[in-house]
Each structure stands twice: as structure tokens, then as C-alpha cells.
Amino acid sequence: MINPIYLIIADLLDRYIGEPPEKLHPVVFIGNFVKFLEKVFPSTHSVEKLKDLVFGFITVFLTVFTVFLIFFTLELILNLISNYYIKLFSYSLILSFSIGHKSLLEFSKAPIKYIMSGDIKSARKSVQHIVSRDTSTLDEKHVISAAVESSSENITDSIIAPLIYAAIFGLSGAFIYRAVNTMDAMLGYKNEKYRYYGKTAAYLDDILNFIPSRIAGILLIISAPFYGGKIVPAIYGYLKEGFKTPSPNSGYTMAVIANSLSMELEKIGCYKLGKGEITVLKAVNSLKAVDYSVLLFLVIYMVLYFNLIY
């Protein structure tokens, strides 16, 4: 377990300063490395299923192993720094690159702001950046829903999960998680090219998100009163609707947000979560839930850490 001060500073750096330029971003490097491995071990587009499975596995293994070596070595180097404050800042700064707190909020706020100004066309284009569905014909209600779904789901992927793995395994844990999450985003499709090639990445992402997604859901339940939600409906959503999405993990945070704020989130033809009118105010409150759930996680981790260590 690492000192919670590292996690707090890392999250604050990302929340208020944001991510580094693309050329310096470790996650961008990971993505480029995966693209390189795809060329070395290419997909057969499901023509040779076993070959796709093997090459997909090799791509995931080499990526995870490389990320582990880099960040484990980096952590060893940081531990050699004798000045506490230099080490604290350096470690926290690097760790902040594994978190997407500010970007999550910015991307989710954008379509909501366009809706508030009455610009539905720009809202559709904006929300297309954060969801995979076709948004070109979505009405106002479904644009807001897509934005809330994205922010709710990505509480786990972008913040809570990296912090959990950092807390337990340090830098290498946080960045291995981000590597797997990145590979799932790049390879985890059920189309001809990735149906078999991306299975390892998709399954590993499901495994690594299983516990963090459920912890994130519980954090959202406990913090519900702070973002304008209700605890009892949130619990109902967690227990009764968390499993309704195609992903085994993404539904828990979305169902809690939907039910705690009494609004229906709908991906047309796929799922419906919660009941009630979806409004801009409720969407804004759902974004507040991001900050409160992260704050609660950091407080709980700090209490656990100092009680276990001292």
C-alpha cells in the first residue's frame, strides 16, 4: 500500500491541471506500442481464429510486460531520491498521468453546455466523442443520457480503478490497468478484425474492472446526498439494475446514478436504467457525483492506511 498523500496529490494535479501533452503522455505511448504490435502480429480478420487468439494474447502480454518493466524500474529510481518533497512531487506527477479526472468532466460537460444553449447539433457532435453509438439523430433527452452514461461508467475506468491499483501495486499497478483499459478500447470489438484478436484484452479488462466497478458503485451510493441523490433508490439500482448492461461492470455506476437522481438512462435498443425525467440539472448533479465519489474513496483509503500502518 502506498501513502495516500501520493494519491491525493496525483488526483489534484489531474483534476485542476489536467493531462500532459500527447507526446509526453504514457497512455499515448501505450496506444502507439499496441499499434506497433498489431503490425508485427496482425489480425487475420477472423480467417484463422486460433492465430488471432494467439496473436491477440501475445500483443496483450508484451504490452503488459513492457509497461510493468518501465514503471517498476521508474518506481525503484524514485525510491532512491533522498529528498522527500522531490520524491513526493515526482511520484505524484507521474501517477497523475494514469488518471483522467479532468478530461472525464470536460468531455461530459461539453454536450450538456450545448443543450443548455439550445444547440442540439453541436451537442450531438460533442457527445459522439465519448460514446460509440450513432448520435446524429439523438434527441435532447438521449444526448443528455449518453453524456451521463459516459461520465458514470468512466468514474471506474478513468479514476477509481487506477487509484485502487496504484494504492495496492504502485505506479506499475496503475499503468498496467490503464494499458489493459487502452487495449480493450482499441481491440475489444466484436467485428471481423477483432472478434478473436481482441478477446484477451476484453476479458482481462472485465477481470480488472470487476471489483473497482462495484466499489465505485458503493461510493456513489454513500455519497448520494452530497450530489443531490437519494441513497435508497441508489441501492435499488445497484442491486436490481447493475447487471442490465452488456458489460458485466459498467452498469453498476450507471444504475446507481440513474436511480439516485430519479432519471432514465437509455441506450436505444440496448438497455434502460432508472425511471424519471432526465434534465440538465440532474445531469449536472451526476457530474458532481464524480468529485464526491473520488473524495470519499480518498478519505476511506486514508483512514484504512493510517489504521493499518500505525
UniProtKB/Swiss-Prot annotation:
The chain crosses the membrane at residues 53-73, 80-100, 157-177, 215-235, 289-309. Pfam families: CobD_Cbib. The lineage of its organism: Archaea, Methanobacteriati, Methanobacteriota, Methanomada group, Methanococci. It is a multi-pass membrane protein. Keywords: Cell membrane, Cobalamin biosynthesis, Membrane, Transmembrane, Transmembrane helix. It is found in: Cell membrane. Belongs to the CobD/CbiB family. GO terms for molecular function: ABC-type vitamin B12 transporter activity; threonine-phosphate decarboxylase activity. GO terms for cellular component: plasma membrane. One of its GO terms (biological process) is cobalamin biosynthetic process. Converts cobyric acid to cobinamide by the addition of aminopropanol on the F carboxylic group. It comes from the Archaea. This is Probable cobalamin biosynthesis protein CobD. NCBIfam families: cobal_cbiB. Pathway: Cofactor biosynthesis; adenosylcobalamin biosynthesis.
